[in-house]
Amino acid sequence: MDEFHRCGKEDSFWQQCFLYPLFFQEDLYAISHDHYLDVSSSSRPMEHLSSNDQLSFLTVKRLIGQIRQQNHSIVLFVNCDPNPLADRKKSFYSESVLEALTLVLEVPFSIWSKYSVEGMNECKSFRSIHSIFPFLEDKFPHSNSILDARIPYSIHPEILVRTFRRWIRDAPSLHPLRSVLYDYRNSPENLQRSIIVVPRVNTRFFLFLLNYYVCECESILFSRLKRSSHSRPLSHGSFPQRTHFHRKIKHIIIFSRRNSLKSIWSLKDPKIHYVRYGERPIIAIKGAHLLVKKCRYYLLIFRQFYFHLWSEPYRVCSHQLSKNCSSSPGYFLRVRMNPIFVRTKMLDELFIADLITNEMDPIVPIVPIIGLLATEKFCDISGRPISKLSWTSLTDDDILDRFDQIWRNLFHYYSGSFDRDGLYRIKYILSLSCAKTLACKHKSTIRVVRKELGPELFKKSFSKEREFDSLPFSSKAAARSQRERIWHSDIPQINPLANSWQKIQDLKIENLFDQ
């Protein structure tokens, strides 16, 4: 690996590196063996772990030889093929080889990512999802439309292998990758598909494939956008999985006007901003409706011709920022632009200028949230709280914890709004629904539940707001806090409520395009 790092700066390194000899390093399989035992021991009882789980390096080499001798040229256009690896897909040695394959492929990929980031001195990274809110406040006031483009996670295995061949010419090292991809493609759930559906499982191999696939898409897409956005900076942010990045590209690429007019995608005075959380990118655009349609068409054509993948039109939808809600990340976000007039006066009143800027004012979309709460059986369609009957079998602490988790995430996300009336209404619905759920469980009334539990009823639940409001502000800071927003972000992951809303929105869009 040290040799890879020494050669990483050479331009020809990506075309000459050889990874196949690494498959026969015993230390590599010792690492993968220990990792496999750590994962399996957490999911299997101790009596199932025996001395048979000892690794034999000779067996590993024989398995690699069988993988290399497989011929996948006959399964490019068929749905199923007898694969010797499929029978022992879940066996001990196949899992060890899969772990080793991931380690080998991560070596050049990590070096490539390191030097690509080091070469961009103008980029700054923040490893936190909290940076998404400064991005929204900084970029959204200068935009009027949003493209919500979902990254397709279904792709033919041969396309993935060929994308690796662009920067790895060591063909033998890609034979195990091709074998594993076709193995999962020929699994029972994918027999009727011509493309591989990457399982949504938290394995290191598939997370690596997903991150590589997203990186490949974005690296090529950004180069195209830079060319089309002549003499304009391109800002983008990336938040893959739990490792979140936010980058602001400050340099300006200048093209001649003659060359810009020749290009199909030479956009006049464009402002394009890109942010992604998980598999849901958001592109904020300032421009006419024709520009938004061109960008949407470009994304669809880019996926179709570069990855040979038909992308459904509903996976890239556009809407105006001032009229529609957007999801970022997974929650509702409705923005109202408030114009701010600033007058500047020069010395001796020789010059006076009026500047007009926009300020982002997030709004709590109370109607869509009530509709979502009604779908999840917390209230009816008019917003009247009801008991959550499916939770009556839980303990009192579990019920309070679940309501507390939903309220905490909603409050942290929408606490930056000036107008909190809608937020307090949501709190009322959740608190009364929690009380009705406890009353239904104990077969009593809300008054009896409050009388028996007393102040302990909501002492634990809905306490996050009190912690937030009781922060030690000074008198001047407290007065300023009434005028300014304070983002209090604590969203390590999207809760089931937001995921449920996202599924409803996706289903509505799919039904709209099916009609």
UniProtKB/Swiss-Prot annotation:
Its main location: plastid. It is found in: Plastid, Chloroplast. GO terms for biological process: mRNA processing; RNA splicing; tRNA processing. It comes from the Eukaryota. GO terms for molecular function: RNA binding. It holds the Pfam family Intron_maturas2. The keyword Chloroplast applies. One of its GO terms (cellular component) is chloroplast. Keywords: Chloroplast, mRNA processing, Plastid, RNA-binding, tRNA processing. Coiled coil: none annotated. Belongs to the intron maturase 2 family. MatK subfamily. Usually encoded in the trnK tRNA gene intron. Probably assists in splicing its own and other chloroplast group II introns. This is Maturase K. It comes from Pinus pinaster.
